[in-house]
From Swiss-Prot:
It holds the Pfam family FlgH. The lineage of its organism: Bacteria, Pseudomonadati, Pseudomonadota, Gammaproteobacteria, Vibrionales. This is Flagellar L-ring protein. It comes from Photobacterium profundum (strain SS9). The basal body constitutes a major portion of the flagellar organelle and consists of four rings (L,P,S, and M) mounted on a central rod. GO terms for cellular component: bacterial-type flagellum basal body, distal rod, L ring; cell outer membrane. GO terms for molecular function: cytoskeletal motor activity. A lipid is attached at residue 16 (S-diacylglycerol cysteine).
Length: 256
């Protein structure tokens, strides 16, 4: 009896493992452990990448693939049996703003930030102690050939200053796709642009959440209206590497 029960349990477990509903979807298979903007967070085992402590993003990353809406057959019926679909329907006097997955919107990059910080600290401390020679009977009191007097002086001074001034600006445009529609109607967007130059590649990546009401009639939206925005403009290759300190220079520049 125990053998029969054990066999039934094994068959049930095998059936669950073969259930197509539990199998990973095509989207999960194509998804990599890639950050939304900065690229792969997995370190390469190569010596160069280990010393650089970073890995360049790559064009054609599956995590940044274009979103392709599912194609509908030429003749189809909705769940209600009607040919009319309220999701795809558009009013006669309605605008053509993006509202669905795969729609395109142009982001106008207008970012400018500036930060300044300065601090200073001064510490000054001094101590002076002295005692005149003791006089006893009109004569200085001595021990041997030394009189009983002392003089002590101590001074301690510290001064430290620090300042930081950082500013950046970016101006341009990039077209991105709607990758998800939230329950409140907000749109999640994502997109990238790669430029191949003579000495390397440059890329722009943008992701975040926008409101359809903020999209203009020209199908554009300002980057300052993107919430949870992640904007990256950088490059790859040797030209980018020379702008960063090497691992040995960083080692000697550590503050002790």
């Amino acid at each position: 009896m125990k053998k029969v029960l054990a066999g039934i349990v094994i068959l049930l477990l095998n059936g669950c493992a073969m259930d197509p509903d539990l199998a990973p979807s095509d989207i999960e298979k194509a998804t990599t452990t890639v950050d939304a903007v900065e690229g792969s967070t997995e370190q390469d085992s190569g010596l160069i990448d280990m010393l650089r402590r970073r890995e360049d993003p790559q064009a054609g990353d599956p995590a940044w693939n274009p979103i392709r809406p599912q194609a509908k057959p030429e003749h189809y019926a909705t769940a209600t049996g009607s040919l009319f679909s309220s999701i795809q329907a558009q009013d006669l006097y309605d605008d053509t703003k993006p509202r669905g997955i795969g729609d395109i919107v142009t982001v106008m990059l207008e970012e400018k930030t500036q930060a300044k910080k300065s601090a200073s600290s001064d510490l000054d401390k001094s101590t002076d102690l002295s005692m005149d020679p003791l006089v006893l009977g009109g004569k200085p009191l001595t021990i041997g050939d030394r009189d009983l007097s002392y003089e002590v002086a101590n001074a301690n001074k510290f001064s430290g200053t620090t300042s930081a001034d950082q500013s950046n600006s970016i101006k341009g445009s990039i077209s991105v796709e709607v990758i998800d529609v939230l329950a409140n109607g907000n749109l999640m967007i994502r997109g990238e642009k790669w430029l191949t130059l003579n000495t390397g590649d440059e890329y722009i990546r943008v992701s975040g959440t926008i409101r359809p009401d903020d999209i203009s009639q020209e199908n554009t939206i300002e980057s300052t209206r993107i919430t949870n925005a992640r904007i990256q403009y950088s490059g790859t290759g040797n030209r980018q590497d020379v702008q960063e300190q090497g691992w040995l220079a960083n080692f000697f520049n550590v503050s002790l």
